[in-house]
Every structure is written in C-alpha cells, then in structure tokens.
C-alpha cells in the first residue's frame, strides 16, 4: 500500500533539511575570486600512458570493503531483512526500465528510445516481477502519454511488489525533462541548467529544484536523477554541455547543491551525477567508454568540488562509465571500480549514502562486459543500485549465483540492501 504522500513529503523534507548546501549547512569554501569565468579548454589526450592497461575482467578475488554503516543487530530494517529471500534482497539492487518487465520485448527494444514503451502494468509484467522483484523503475519519455495514465502507472508499479519500488525519472530541467517536455503536460519549463547557473543566483537553482520536485511528487515519483553536478570544461564534450550549471567548479557546486535542496524540500531524492566527472571527457558514455586523463589532484580541484563542498547527507550519487587511468592504472569504468567508489568516493570524500551506477545498458559498459559480469563487478566495487542492466535476467541471476558461490559475500549484499531500505524508509515509501 502506498503511504500518504503528504507524510512522505514531510518525512523526507525533514530528514534532508540538513543536506546539500554550500551556504547554509554544508561545508563552507572560500568565495571564488571575482574574475571572469574561463572558457572551456580541452584536456590534452596523451598518446600513451605507461601505467595504462586494458580494463581487467571482473573477478571474485577482490571484493570491495565499503566503509559504510554496519546494520545494527535487532533494528527494524535488520529484522525485516531476516524475512527476505535471496531473490528479494537481490531485487532491491536493481532499478530498471518498465519495458524490462515486458517479456515480449527484446533487449534492443527495451533499451531503445525509438520503440514504443509500456505505459501500463500488465499481468505479464506482474508475472515477471514475481520472478524478478526489482527495487525500482525508471520512467522514460516513451513510457509517458498523459497525466492520468502516468499517475495510474506509477501507483500500480509502487504496489506491485512486497517492498515498494523507487520510482525515478530524469527530470533535470532543460533538454532532459521527460515530463515537462511532453506536450500533454502543462508544466514549467527551463531553458537549461547552464542558463540558471549563468544567473549567478543560487535561489533560482533552488526554485527550479523545488518546482520540479513538486510536480514529480504529484505524479508519484520519489527519485530524480538530478542534479547534474558535472563541471563543463571541455568544448569537445557533447553529452553534458548546457546540462551542467557552469564551467566553474564552485559555481557548479553551489547551483547543484541548491537544486538538490529544492528537490529534497518536496520529498524527492536528489541524485548527483556523474562521478568522477563527465564535463571534461570527449567521449559520450552512451556510445563507448569515456576517459578522463586528469590526475587525482586535478579532479579534486575541479570535478570533485560539487561532492566535497556540499553536504550530501540523504542524497544519492550516480557513478558514470568513466575511466580514470591516472588514478586506477587501467581503463576500468568508475562504475565498476573499487578504487573510484570505495577508495575515493566513499573513503576520501566520505560519502556513505546510496551509490547508483549510470545505465548499465550503455556501450561504456556493454562493449566490454556481459550484463552478469558487470552487475557483479559493480556490487563488489561498492555500488548499491544497478541501473538499467542490458539484460535484467542475466544481471539479476548473475548476482544471485555470485552470492550463492561466495563471489559476492553475503555481508556485501546485506550492506547494500540495508542502505536501499534505509533510503526507502527516508522517502516514506517503506516501513519495516
């Protein structure tokens, strides 16, 4: 049964009131010097990097030790987890397209933006959910026709499994806005995050987040894959562009924090993206592996500023399919890298919240990994939620088999399940 939406909004707003701000309650950085914002400059691509090797295939030998909270013995979530089957636990780690629940669709059809999307929950889809009780569904433009159909769809999805689902959408404002850019919806539209950032007014960014969060909550969503926290510094970059708030790290951080605060005020979980930084890459991870050749110090001084200067309590972070060979020594995507997730995001930056991959159907992963191997590698790297695997059954069953064989420890599984349930409780959609 769905919780009262007002209670859900109030609960998350209260829990996140301390989150995501540079000026109010986040760590305060020195103000940016009053100089002109530099134009984007490309990072030179080296012809060879001596330490660089091909990305290793995932193995069971080096599971990440994620520095997260240990589930307290006897607490309500732990007691609830004791009643869950292995498949129910594994299901909490998967956030899928609704089309992945339609047995009539091929992987190509599921992951294409050109095919007709499912817009209602059918009995066949309910049967798939019985076998694959996923923890979340991400709605795309092709799954949206009109307001009433969408409300019915999100309501049906939420109650279709034992543990209510996260319902998420990409609603950044501007180019990427699945609801606002649909002509059937009379919703506020924004030119772009870049236009908001150029105003220099963080209140405008917070108002954008608040406005978007309000209408997302109205349509049953509790997760927004926003804000874009990337710093746009490479003019050759075609995937981020105006989706970023600024070419300046501190401005991007301030605006992303304000936008996230606005989303949270409406009971919508903000997801900062795309760690370790997609604004300086030349490649689009939809089409292949993106690579940043920056050093640790260069990333810390630019791309990581939105993560290090904002209080991310109660927020989620999306990790991209971006290799950082000068930090890892190879071309493993950050989404599958224990070094990037456990050592840097969780360790150095101190993030103990929900970590989500970017879509695992992107060529940045699928060109080198099977759906099952990618899911296992991500989990062992410290990821909590696997977003949109290329083939749900292969990824899901791959994780189940890995847990049964010990390739993924039960402790590693339980850690992420616990965190997912904590966040669902925070969102007001789950009560153990």
Go through each PLM region and give its residues.
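Bacterial N-terminal signal peptides that target proteins for export
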Residues: 2-13
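C-terminal motif of bacterial Sec signal peptides marking the signal peptidase cleavage site
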Residues: 20-24
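N-terminal hydrophobic targeting/anchoring segments and the immediately downstream early-domain regions
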Residues: 26-29, 33, 39-167, 171-181
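Second-shell residues forming the walls of enzyme active-site clefts
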Residues: 82-85, 109-117, 121, 145-165, ...
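Hydrophobic faces of well-ordered beta-strands that scaffold small-molecule active sites
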Residues: 90-98, 135-139, 165-171, 223-227, ...
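Substrate-binding cleft of extracellular glycoside hydrolase catalytic domains
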Residues: 163-209
């Amino acid at each position: 049964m769905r919780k009262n939406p007002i209670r859900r909004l109030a609960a998350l707003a209260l829990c996140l009131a301390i989150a995501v701000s540079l000026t109010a309650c986040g760590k305060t950085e020195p103000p940016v010097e009053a100089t002109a914002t530099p134009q984007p400059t490309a990072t030179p691509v080296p012809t060879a990097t001596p330490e660089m090797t091909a990305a290793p295939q995932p193995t069971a030998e080096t599971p990440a030790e994620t520095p997260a909270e240990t589930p307290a013995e006897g607490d309500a979530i732990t007691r609830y987890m004791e009643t869950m089957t292995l498949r129910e636990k594994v299901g909490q780690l998967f956030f899928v397209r609704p089309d992945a629940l339609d047995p009539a669709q091929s992987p190509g059809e599921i992951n294409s933006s050109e095919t007709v999307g499912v817009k209602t929950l059918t009995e066949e889809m309910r049967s798939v959910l019985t076998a694959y009780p996923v923890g979340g569904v991400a709605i795309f433009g092709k799954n949206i026709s009109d307001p009433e159909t969408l409300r019915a769809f999100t309501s049906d999805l939420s109650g279709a499994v034992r543990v209510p689902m996260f319902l998420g959408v990409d609603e950044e404002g501007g180019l990427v806005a699945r609801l606002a850019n649909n002509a059937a919806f009379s919703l506020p539209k924004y030119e772009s995050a870049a236009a908001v950032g150029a105003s220099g007014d963080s209140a405008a960014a917070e108002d954008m987040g608040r406005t978007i969060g309000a209408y997302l909550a109205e349509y049953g969503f509790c997760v927004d894959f926003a804000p874009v926290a990337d710093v746009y510094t490479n003019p050759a970059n075609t995937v981020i562009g105006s989706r970023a708030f600024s070419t300046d790290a501190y401005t991007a951080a301030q605006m992303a924090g304000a936008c996230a605060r606005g989303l949270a005020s409406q009971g919508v979980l903000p997801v900062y993206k795309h760690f370790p930084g997609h604004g300086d890459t030349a490649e689009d991870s939809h089409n292949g592996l993106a690579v940043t050749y920056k050093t640790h110090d260069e990333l810390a001084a630019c791309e990581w500023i939105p993560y290090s200067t904002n209080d991310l309590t109660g927020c989620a972070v999306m990790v991209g399919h971006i290799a950082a060979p000068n930090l890892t020594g190879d071309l493993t995507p950050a989404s599958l890298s224990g070094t990037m997730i456990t050592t840097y995001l969780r360790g150095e930056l101190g993030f103990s919240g929900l970590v989500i991959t970017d879509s695992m159907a992107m060529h940045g992963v699928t060109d080198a990994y099977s759906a099952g191997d990618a899911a296992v590698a991500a989990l062992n790297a410290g990821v909590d939620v696997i977003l949109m695997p290329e083939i749900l059954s292969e990824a899901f069953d791959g994780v189940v088999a890995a847990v049964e064989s010990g390739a993924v420890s039960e402790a590693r599984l339980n850690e992420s399940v616990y965190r997912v349930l904590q966040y669902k409780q925070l969102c007001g959609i789950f009560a153990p």
